[in-house]
């Protein structure tokens, strides 16, 4: 078999006659090879090509140093690998069928390779995006950075394009991965793998790739389907955690990414040139360009770019450096940006193990959903001793109940650490974190951001993850005057149900509502009544016609209807009733909301129901715009307190009116609450009977043993 100095490998699929311009630029570049007496061959691989493309390339079939292949791989990675295996050149360059190269690319890159004293990969210095209705963007590529800095940049940014030249042996040693099922960007993976192996990426000075932006390219398809790269050893948390503080890539810290970068992101997000880079992750990088850096670069297009830009015009008349185009062309250096990597580095400090389960929640605070998570974790640990967990919080709130997490749990405060990143970068970062955790079991509880991530990455989840969710109820929307409802099952679960393995809930009512509303398969749901492990205390005894001390304990937020407490209190005699309100105020309720109401005594925040002096109270009043089976009802029952509750969601499954407690059927019926409170004052004895029945139900249905039995069926 004849050997060559260089193999020029062209990948094509459906470029049609556009490929003619590509081939003309290649043939112009080969003239420089011939001048230097560098032997070469041209291999053309048509992958799933259309007829126009196939017919066009037939004209080269009889050229002595051209070979044409046809296959149906449907992926750039296998196409490049095929060409590497067929190559007879000592060195090999990959080119795409719709781009153009400056006529010096082949000879300069070849010279850089043979002059290297170590194994290297060469890329063009400039990449100029062009195309119909596409803004020109000039990307300046730079050489490999010190390893730790390169890691931080590569974490969120593919530094080098897919157009390269290297020893054929290098490309055979590091074949492109065939990525499917939600994974993509084989060139990004190649760059990371070779960098991890210690191979330097260098630049062929003053060479340019003219990248034609088209909407039908496979690379654009990768961008539009939210595909990501798989786990990479180079980004392993343990390695990144060891980085020195001074290894961080240089970032202009005085520029607020939230104010500058996101402002620019919003300005350019709808422009076609976002996909300008030959590599898909460049879409991400343009979105975090900030004006601060660009002000110093606009108008300073390197002379070699202007020269080659004009020189290519006879081959492609769309390309010419008109003064007005030069003025508006933005310059971009992929090595400049590292915000994703910097944030990843901070996250890495919280990662101490490979988890068996990942929980994605908005926060870890004092709440029923948080207790559900804690119960699940405790049960899993009992079923599978030694299990490890990672909890990812997606809102920037303070996680006041982080102390309640099991010791074998890593808490990643993603919402706090990633605050300020534009949406695309935030999604890219979360994808990287989840992938690098190497855990296939994901569980979402009430996190809108996690649901949005799952919606974007359904193909990934379907093929590589086991996704379960917990959801408990729909609830009235206060702004609708309590006539409309919100629920996580629609749209969040409804949008992703094909990739959800199981929907856990704490009440049957929600299952019935969701099946009726959304036609979801009832088999998808699993009711797990939450356990109560508190000591069951004697039933509280209250004397008839004495002043009633009412306990109300919850977050003081509109969803818990604090306005109803005030309305109820205003209809009660302060000589006969006292309502003590416990709970931290949310931002949607004024902290002086209860001031001036004689019956109400605001007692401040509390740290779990067990911290409350329940023995001082006669009855629990519970109000809410929507619920499953609230944990506080179980806890109050265990404490021996009678319960008066609003009847919504699954509340009635535990508080059965005049059997295990007292219900107000219309949750906004002020007179209904007042009437029942007055009834309790007159007849507390019958409420003691309700508590006895409720405690019996508690022992039968809400025991830890019953909960573990249910958990074992799925975990």
Role assignments for model-derived ranges:
Residues 71-87:
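Glycine-rich, basic loop-to-helix element that forms the pyrophosphate-binding segment
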Residues 1-3, 232, 245-356:
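Non-catalytic membrane-proximal stalk/linker segments that position and tether the catalytic domains
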Residues 625:
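Aromatic "clamp/platform" in nucleotide-sugar-dependent glycosyltransferases that forms part
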Residues 642-645:
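Short hydrophobic beta-strand element within catalytic cores of glycosyltransferases
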Residues 26-69:
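Acidic donor-binding segment of Leloir-type glycosyltransferases
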Residues 182-190:
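Acidic donor-binding loop at a coil-to-helix junction in glycosyltransferase catalytic cores
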Residues 314-321, 482, 486, 491, ...:
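A short, active-site helix/loop in glycosyltransferases that binds the activated sugar's phosphate group
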Residues 106-137:
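Conserved donor NDP-sugar-binding/catalytic core segment of glycosyltransferases
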């Amino acid at each position: 078999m004849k050997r060559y100095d260089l193999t020029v490998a062209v990948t094509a699929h459906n470029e049609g006659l556009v490929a003619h311009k590509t081939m003309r630029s290649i043939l112009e570049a080969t003239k420089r090879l011939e001048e230097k007496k560098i032997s070469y061959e041209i291999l053309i691989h048509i992958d799933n090509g259309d007829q126009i493309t196939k017919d066009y390339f037939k004209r080269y079939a009889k050229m002595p140093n051209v070979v044409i292949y046809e296959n149906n791989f449907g992926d750039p990675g296998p196409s490049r690998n095929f060409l590497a295996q067929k190559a007879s050149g000592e060195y090999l360059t990959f080119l795409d069928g719709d781009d153009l190269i400056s006529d010096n690319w082949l000879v300069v890159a070849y010279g850089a390779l043979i002059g290297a004293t170590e194994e290297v990969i060469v890329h063009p210095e400039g990449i100029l995006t062009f195309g119909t209705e596409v803004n020109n963007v000039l990307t300046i590529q730079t050489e490999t950075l010190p390893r730790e800095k390169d890691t931080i940049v590569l974490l969120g940014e593919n530094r080098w394009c897919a157009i390269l030249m290297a020893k054929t042996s290098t490309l055979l040693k590091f074949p492109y991965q065939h990525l499917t099922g939600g994974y993509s960007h084989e060139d990004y993976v190649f760059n990371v793998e070779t960098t991890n192996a210690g191979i330097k990426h260098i630049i062929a000075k003053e060479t340019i790739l003219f990248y034609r932006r088209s909407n039908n390219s496979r690379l654009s398809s990768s961008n539009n389907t939210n595909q990501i790269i798989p786990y990479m050893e180079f980004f392993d948390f343990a390695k990144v955690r060891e980085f020195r503080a001074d290894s961080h890539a240089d970032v202009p810290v005085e520029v607020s990414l939230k104010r500058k970068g996101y402002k620019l992101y919003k300005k350019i997000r709808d422009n076609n040139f976002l996909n300008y880079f030959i590599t898909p992750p460049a879409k991400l990088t343009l979105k975090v360009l900030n004006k601060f850096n660009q002000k110093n670069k606009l108008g300073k297009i390197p002379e070699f770019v202007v020269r080659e830009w004009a020189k290519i015009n006879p081959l492609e008349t769309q390309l010419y450096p008109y003064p007005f185009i030069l003025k508006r062309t933005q310059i971009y250096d992929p090595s400049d940006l590292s915000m994703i990597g910097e944030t990843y580095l901070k996250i890495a400090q919280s990662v101490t193990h490979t988890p068996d389960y990942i929980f994605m929640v908005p926060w870890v605070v004092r709440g029923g959903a948080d207790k559900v998570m804690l119960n699940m974790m405790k049960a899993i640990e009992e079923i599978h001793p030694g299990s490890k967990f990672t909890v990812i919080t997606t809102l920037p709130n303070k996680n006041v109940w982080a102390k309640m997490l099991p010791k074998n749990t890593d808490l990643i405060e993603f919402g706090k650490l990633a605050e300020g990143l534009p949406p695309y970068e935030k999604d890219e970062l979360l994808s990287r974190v989840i992938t690098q955790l190497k855990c296939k079991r994901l569980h979402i509880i009430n996190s809108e951001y996690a649901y949005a991530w799952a919606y974007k990455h359904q193909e990934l989840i379907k093929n590589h993850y086991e996704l379960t969710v917990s959801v408990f109820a729909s609830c009235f929307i206060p702004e609708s005057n309590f006539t409309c409802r919100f629920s996580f099952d629609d749209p969040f679960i409804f949008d992703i149900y094909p990739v959800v393995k199981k929907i856990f809930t704490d009440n049957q009512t929600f299952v019935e509502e969701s099946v009726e509303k959304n036609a979801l398969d009832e088999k998808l749901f699993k009711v797990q009544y939450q356990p109560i492990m508190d000591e069951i205390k004697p039933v509280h005894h209250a004397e008839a016609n004495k002043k009633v001390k009412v306990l109300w304990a919850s977050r003081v937020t509109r969803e818990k209807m604090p306005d109803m407490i005030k309305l109820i209190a205003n209809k009660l005699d302060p000589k006969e009733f006292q309502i003590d309100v416990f709970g931290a105020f949310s931002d949607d309720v004024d902290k002086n909301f209860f001031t001036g109401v004689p019956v109400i005594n605001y007692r401040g925040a509390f740290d779990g129901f067990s911290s409350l002096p329940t023995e001082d109270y006669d009855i629990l009043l519970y109000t809410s715009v929507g619920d499953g089976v609230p944990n506080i009802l179980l806890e109050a029952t265990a404490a021996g307190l009678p319960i008066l509750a609003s009847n919504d969601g699954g509340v009635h499954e535990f508080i059965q009116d005049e059997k295990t407690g007292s219900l107000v059927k219309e949750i906004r019926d002020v007179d209904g609450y007042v009437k029942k409170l007055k009834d309790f004052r007159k007849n507390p004895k019958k409420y003691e009977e309700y508590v006895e029945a409720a405690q019996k139900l508690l022992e039968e249905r809400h025991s830890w043993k019953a909960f573990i039995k249910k958990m074992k069926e799925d975990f």
